[in-house]
């Protein structure tokens, strides 16, 4: 089952968690005090570059409908949409640049280039997801209401199509994001406030309608006036650009919470949760992937998902330097710092989806010690005296060491079993 006591699972005392919070608060203060012109210049240049890229893509599509120009224009437009959504829109709406007091680059005014309303995203993502990260029954991002991503979710027949559902979700990800705040499930079950639901539906329809008109009516009609393009060529290019953005966004976001090591939590964790426990839950419930400058930029710096969840309102261009200090904090408290290559992390999310399409009786691991979900019960065999300092080395024995010890014992049991089975056959 999911983690019910984050302190026990992390092998930390109350004093440890207070000290952890103080260290992470210090990192925040240092970044806030050093924010300035360099950061403002970064976001303004990023916005200018993104807009130039979008114009270039649309000019390419207007100039010619030949295959090379069409693909170049569609890819350019797709990349522009990725940058606008990932590095600009998502981060601006988190308030990362509100300190600049620029009315254009502000969380309260930015409307991003996708079918979902910024107002709805700020609630479902900034408030619900970031406050209740990976808490079952509270964070709707745990499976998005259609995917089984942990053994803690009861298997249902439609889960057999887990991989199919995520393929569909990836292709139309912007629509999944747009529909999330409508809470369609509650509406059908009669549990939604009718007036609030009507308001959300009107807001969704207005934004989605404008987006569909822009991408699939206005721009195709405009470019059809050019002798080198047709309405259909631009329409299909816009569809491809949106799918490119959708699939990439889905991949990056899924790498942040569904690879092995991204923990899940029960509702009881939120009762009187102090700041240190909130920090700890963000660290344990998130996962990074390794990235160079280009991949960092194209992921909206969400390759640093752990740091983003610790400091969602700090500028994205500072997360890389923050990650060095966060990793050091993890090492001091013997906490795992979950990361890996992009392809490995993304592959693990698909592996989890494939495995969990089956009922638990066909799975080897249990919900207390599985790749995608663990609980404090997995450490029952270590005994109460395990946490603390190693009597030989004097080093702290925390969560990372405890996980390694459990895995070591499990490997030893399997090896012993494989040795005894041939002996039994020989006898």
From Swiss-Prot:
Organism: Mycobacterium tuberculosis (strain ATCC 25618 / H37Rv)
GO cellular component annotations of the record: plasma membrane
The keyword Oxidoreductase is assigned to this record: yes
Disruption phenotype: Strains lacking this gene are shown to be attenuated in a mouse tuberculosis model.
Subunit architecture: Interacts with the electron transfer protein Rv3230c to form a functional acyl-CoA desaturase complex.
Pathway where it operates: Lipid metabolism; fatty acid metabolism
Entry keyword annotation includes Lipid biosynthesis: yes
Catalytic activity: octadecanoyl-CoA + NADPH + O2 + H(+) = (9Z)-octadecenoyl-CoA + NADP(+) + 2 H2O
Function: Is likely involved in the aerobic desaturation system responsible for the synthesis of oleic acid from stearoyl-CoA; oleic acid is a precursor of mycobacterial membrane phospholipids and triglycerides. Catalyzes the conversion of stearoyl-CoA to oleoyl-CoA by introduction of a cis double bond between carbons 9 and 10 of the acyl chain. Requires the electron transfer partner Rv3230c to pass two electrons from NADPH to its active site diiron center. Is also able to catalyze the 9-desaturation of palmitoyl-CoA to palmitoleoyl-CoA.
Membrane topology value: Multi-pass membrane protein
Top enzyme class: oxidoreductase
Family, per entry: Belongs to the fatty acid desaturase type 1 family.
Protein name in UniProt: NADPH-dependent stearoyl-CoA 9-desaturase
EC number: 1.14.19.n4
């Amino acid at each position: 089952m999911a983690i019910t006591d984050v302190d026990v699972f992390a092998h930390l005392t109350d004093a440890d968690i207070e000290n952890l919070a103080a260290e992470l608060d210090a990192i925040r203060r240092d970044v806030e005090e050093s924010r300035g012109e360099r950061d403002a210049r970064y976001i303004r240049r990023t916005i200018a570059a993104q807009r130039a890229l979008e114009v270039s893509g649309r000019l390419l599509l207007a100039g010619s409908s030949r295959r090379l120009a069409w693909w170049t224009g569609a890819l350019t437009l797709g990349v522009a949409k990725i940058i606008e959504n990932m590095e600009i829109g998502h981060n601006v709406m988190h308030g990362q640049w509100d300190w600049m007091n620029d009315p254009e680059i502000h969380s309260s005014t930015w409307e991003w280039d996708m079918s979902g309303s910024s107002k709805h995203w700020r609630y479902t993502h900034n408030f619900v997801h970031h406050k209740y990260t990976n808490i079952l029954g509270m964070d709707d991002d745990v499976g998005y209401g259609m995917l089984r991503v942990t053994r803690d979710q009861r298997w249902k027949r439609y889960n057999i199509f887990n991989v199919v559902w995520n393929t569909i979700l990836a292709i139309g990800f912007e629509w999944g994001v747009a529909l999330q705040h409508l809470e369609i499930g509650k509406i059908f079950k009669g549990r939604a406030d009718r007036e609030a639901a009507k308001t959300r539906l009107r807001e969704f329809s207005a934004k989605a309608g404008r987006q569909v008109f822009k991408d699939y009516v206005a721009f195709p009609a405009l470019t059809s006036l050019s002798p080198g393009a047709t309405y259909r060529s631009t329409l299909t290019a816009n569809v491809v650009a949106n799918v490119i953005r959708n699939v990439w966004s889905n991949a990056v976001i899924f790498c942040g919470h569904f690879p092995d090591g991204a923990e899940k939590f029960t509702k009881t964790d939120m009762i009187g949760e102090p700041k240190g426990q909130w920090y700890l839950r963000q660290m344990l419930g998130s996962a990074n992937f390794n990235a160079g400058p280009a991949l960092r930029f194209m992921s909206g710096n969400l390759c640093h998902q752990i740091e983003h969840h610790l400091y969602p309102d700090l500028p994205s261009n500072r997360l890389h330097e923050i990650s060095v200090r966060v990793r050091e904090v993890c090492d001091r408290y013997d906490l795992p710092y979950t990361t890996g290559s992009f392809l490995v992390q993304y592959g693990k999310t698909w592996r989890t989806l494939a495995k969990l399409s089956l009922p638990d009786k066909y799975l080897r691991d249990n919900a207390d010690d599985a790749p995608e979900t663990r609980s404090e019960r997995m450490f029952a065999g270590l005994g109460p005296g395990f946490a603390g300092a190693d009597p030989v080395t004097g080093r702290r024995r925390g969560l990372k060491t405890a996980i390694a010890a459990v895995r070591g014992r499990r490997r030893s049991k399997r090896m012993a079993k494989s040795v005894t089975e041939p002996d039994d056959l020989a006898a």
